[in-house]
Amino acid sequence: MKTIDLLLNNYWIVKETDKENYYAVKHEINDKNIKRFIQEMLGWKIIHSEHVIKLEKIPSHAEPFMGIQEFTEIRDYCLLCAVLLYLEDKEENNQFLLSDLIRYIETVISKYIEVDWTSFSQRKSLVRVLQYVENKGLLKTYEGDSSIYSREQSSEVLYE
């Protein structure tokens, strides 16, 4: 039951920041009873990778409180998806520049929404997403400060 409690009470369990719980849950989710209970009784799915374990709890209908509190625009969610796609292709401890991420976002998202990094509001939106992802432990700032990007388009940050 501790495993289910951990999955319910944590948005995700990151190996790097919570090794003990990560390995405990990883070991327990291979138990067919727990897996069956989560999938058949609750109708949820366990997402497991070498870095993260997450219980994907999709509600039957959305409620106003269900969004990410830090996000203020729909664009924030679009940028989050692009950032997560970019990070998924990166290996652990692989450093990259903010400018590389921005180029990737432009190619992925430009089909769906307008991307104009000269706009303060769009740069601010990206900064909100980067800070959110960093707070969740999926990204580390190695050198620089992403919040400066909202004010200065030419600023550069090194991430890991």
Describe each model-derived feature in a short phrase.
Residues 1-69, 116, 130, 145-149, ...:
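Eukaryotic partner-binding/assembly regions in large regulatory complexes
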Residues 11, 74-95:
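Positively charged, polyanion-binding regions of nucleic-acid-associated proteins
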Residues 26, 75, 121-125:
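Short amphipathic alpha-helical segments
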Residues 47-61, 75-80, 102-107:
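A short glycine/small-residue-enriched secondary-structure motif
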Residues 86-159:
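Internal, well-ordered domain-core segments that constitute the primary functional module
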